[in-house]
């Protein structure tokens, strides 16, 4: 198989834990890696097909309530591929945040509109923090330590970012008043 996408490795990691359908993989992604690596159905199903063709997963038909579905399981080659990828150094971190991009160019807006960008970013981070707290509450005594490490990192990051937005709002408000043309 040629160069694999990070989404392919998300799928391998999810089916390493236990066999799953594409639908189950998507549901799991939505409550775990989505906060730092999202995957849509439009990515998951084509990747499952490529992984199966490469012999990294194997699908078996299963019926539930008259509905046909395919359950995917990782193969020995798939486990080797996943472990090889995990051992590689991570790609250089590249943050992409449209809110920060807009804030970077916010001098082009009246101050109140620029402040609204900061307020919306803060509200988004607080909402994400609440969602992560809800996920944390459902985990109980999770045996997997590294997903919990990442969850705690997400909680700390969203809390820090929301606090930063609050401080930036205060600084912008405290700055010299906006000059108005007469």
At which residue positions do the language-model features occur?
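Residue-level recognition of alpha-helical structural elements
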Residues: 40, 110, 114, 143-147
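Acidic interhelical loop/turn segments
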Residues: 133-151
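Long amphipathic alpha-helical coiled-coil segments
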Residues: 173-182
């Amino acid at each position: 198989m040629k160069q694999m996408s990070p989404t392919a490795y998300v799928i391998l990691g999810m089916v390493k834990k236990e066999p799953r359908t594409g639908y189950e993989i998507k549901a799991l992604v939505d409550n775990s890696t989505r906060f730092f690596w999202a995957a849509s159905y439009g990515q998951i199903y084509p990747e499952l097909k490529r992984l199966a063709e490469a012999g990294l997963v194997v699908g078996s038909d299963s019926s539930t309530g008259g509905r046909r579905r395919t359950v995917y399981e990782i193969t020995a080659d798939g486990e080797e591929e996943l472990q090889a990828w995990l051992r590689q150094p991570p790609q250089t971190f590249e943050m992409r945040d449209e809110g920060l991009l807009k804030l970077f160019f916010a001098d082009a807006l009246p101050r109140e509109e620029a402040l609204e960008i900061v307020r919306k970013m803060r509200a988004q981070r607080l909402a994400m923090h609440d969602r992560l707290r809800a996920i944390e509450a459902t985990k109980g005594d999770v045996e997997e330590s590294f997903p919990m490490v990442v969850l705690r990192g997400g909680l700390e990051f969203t809390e820090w970012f929301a606090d930063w937005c609050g401080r930036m709002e205060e600084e912008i408000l405290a700055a010299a008043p906006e000059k108005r043309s007469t």
